[in-house]
Amino acid sequence: MLVNKYHFPFDTIREQQSQIIDELNKIPPEKKYIFLQCGTGIGKSALAVTMGKTAGKAYIVSTSKQLQDQYVKDFSNKGLVTMKGRSNYPCFVLDDKSDCSKGPCIGLPEIKNSCKEHCSYYKQKELANKSQLFCTNYAFLLSSGDLKKRDLLVFDEAHNIENEIISFATINIKPLRTLKKVKKTVTKDDFIFCTRISIDSTKDEIADFVSVFSDKYILPHIESLKGDIALLNIEEKSSKIISALDHITKELKLFESLYNKITMFNSRPEDYCFETLYDGDDFVIKLTPLNPSRILKTYTDRLANKVLFMSATILDFEIFAESLGISTDESAFLSFESTFNPELSPIYNLSCVDLSYKNLDNKDEIDSLIKTIDFIVKQFPNDKGIIHTGNKTITDILYDHFFDDERFLFRITTIENQVIYNDHITSDKPTILVSSSMLEGVDLSDDLSRFQIVCKLPYLSLGDKRIKMKTEMNNKWYELQMWQRLIQSCGRSTRSENDFSKTFILDRLFNRAFFNAKKRGILPQQFEKRIISR
């Protein structure tokens, strides 16, 4: 793949960035897929822009709106235009408080033609379509069926792509609850039909039920909702009309999404993991794609001539490519180490607790956990930090012991990550974040965190049927998922070359996992150099 340094977006190109471009130019042109692992600090976003501008027109896909905003901040003067979901744009057909996710054009396409010139959402989409670099997020890309083919498709933070696709395509149906939503009067035949599936039903029976259920109840309800929108006097713009429209469009989007997912499922039900679970008086049919490969291929074939996967944590190229259904014969893999000094961010392997599921009520293990955390935080009386708990149960255990210490900010059922993060960055006190879900996407640079504690290695739950099935098929995939999550979490508190922090890993399982990963040669050297074992 040819990459022209002339298109580099900054005045100065770093030596390592120049080297990466030279290596990219050595890749045979017939390779459609490029996997580029760039350690923290290299500046992979600038490389994505360089490749996109050289290619001609490109999509750049990120995991979050925050990362999109960073792309805009850095590259909006380089031909990059960002595109987000409807809820980010005001709807001028309604009042100044409503956004485009509530717009009547969702159910009435003919309205779109009349307001397209004035609609902030469609105007932004038109700008993005005309731009050289169309920057968006995974959710928008996966839910948009009208995007045109470009020369290059860049997946940033590509280690998340499997989770993004699986989350997007997973189907959850509660037949009786759904039936009550879509029918004003539920007949005896309706009830009998919706209760014919049980936890003992076969895959074929479930697949047949879902297909018929979709055509019999979901599709007619979608048409009914569109009819309800058409009956509203939109021009009145009263609070009653706007409230009704908000309710209808939310329900319409929900059912259209469900119908589209079922249509995807109907084409190849054998690719899915089937589950039926009781939920009170109802039950849940959960259908999860076992692998993202088929869905990913429909997007890559439709949207780009070449595809670039970028991440700091691809780690195992063969396992990663296999999990996406991509042949190594049509791929190229390049890896470059982080420029950060490992001595500034040591990781202390304490190996002092075993917090496996069977030990979560083991008094000795819990006492050891509490004492170790208490000792560590007292070494940093004036510093902020973060504790990665590993799961909600451990978060609750720590909450029970430290809830009266005002330093600790807990992610518990009623308090979201964003709330405690905002409290953390605005507080003058040496606060400590405690969460099981701040492994990535959180910037704790400089004094926002000088230490972090990893209580338990972030293995995916084997209680999830799909995870268990994939692990039984290939345990290396399971280990890879853990290492991607762990390395990401260990990077939350050192965000620049001169930044520094200390990380403490408490999990006794780390020794074995680290030995096996080193043997496989999948860990970045910079990460290995950070490890200090006692």
Regions found by a protein language model. Name each.
Residues 131, 138-139, 157-161, 165, ...:
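Conserved Walker B
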Residues 115, 121-132, 142-152, 297-301:
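Short basic/glycine-enriched coil/helix segment immediately N-terminal to the Walker B
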Residues 127-142, 426-440:
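Conserved two-lobed SF2 helicase motor
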Residues 44:
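Conserved lysine of the Walker
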Residues 2-9, 15-25, 29-39, 77-111, ...:
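Conserved coupling segment at the C-terminus of the helicase ATP-binding
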Residues 84-89, 138-140, 389-393, 409-422, ...:
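Conserved helicase motor
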Residues 351-364, 413-513:
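Conserved RecA-like P-loop NTPase helicase motor core
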Residues 47-50, 54-93, 392:
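Conserved Walker A/P-loop ATP-binding site and its immediately adjacent core
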